[in-house]
Amino acid sequence: NRSQHTTEEALVSDPTAQPQYDMSVVRGFAISALVWGIVGMTVGLLAAVQLAWPEFNWGILHFGRIRPIHTNAVIFGFTLGVVFAGSYYGIQRLCRVRMFSDTLSRINLWGWNAIIVAAAITLFLGKSTAKEYAELEWPIDIAIAVVWVIYAINVFGTLAKRREKTMYAAIWFWVATVLTIAMLHIVNSAALPVSMWKSYSAYAGVHDANIQWWYGHNAVGFLLTTPILGLMYYFLPKQAGRPIYSHRLSILHFWSLIFIYIWAGPHHLIY
């Protein structure tokens, strides 16, 4: 847009100028994270009550439908909302440039929240693949892949035009999240549709179980761990008023997590 081009022209003429960062997408995801956090935790409270007092399982509002609404709202609505907000905030400042595309940022914001709304509605209606943390049916899975690719283009486009040569540790962790979640989602969600809201997994038996918990384990690792570590590496030194103790240790931390964590999914199948 015009303001973005004006900012870039000013930076070319004066390399020391402070870029105008896009804060609207940060605010948007922060607000949506709060909303989904409240929704998810309220539904989670109902699920906990239903476990303790089964008489609170009312009709279609039973535990089997309430629980996946809770997990999807908290993981993909609340936590990922925080991750999106934090990464959009941090990447711009660590690269010292505005995000690659304001339009892609808006599509990411509104597209992702539309996906969470669609997830809540379809799960409430009983439309589910019955795969934990991957319950959503194939039309929503495709939408997730599209919006995630848009986020990836925005991130890598920003990195390509960055004005800071060194990529700080936080960016490494966010990039790992972008790449790994795309791979996990596409492989685990491969399915054969038989109707608009019904599909069967492309895998069978023990292979399906192994792939599902390779995904489930790494959803924890690359949605709830690596991006949060990225936020920690960015905000902790700022709050402490001191630089990170060792950039080399942070890179060792990163590669240790990448090489060890991703292969441990089958332990979820040991009972």
Predicted feature locations:
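Functional cores that coordinate and move charged inorganic groups
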Residues: D208-I211, G241
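Hydrophobic cores of alpha-helical transmembrane segments in multi-pass integral membrane proteins
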Residues: R27-E55, I60-K127, W138-L159, I171-M196, ...
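Extramembrane terminal tails and long inter-domain/linker segments of multi-pass membrane proteins
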Residues: N1-G28, E55-I60, Y200-D208
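Segments that form or flank anion-binding pockets
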Residues: E132-L136
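Cytoplasmic juxtamembrane interface segments
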Residues: L11-D22, V149-M167
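Intrinsically disordered, low-complexity sequence elements enriched in Ser/Thr/Gly/Pro
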Residues: N1-S3, L104, R163
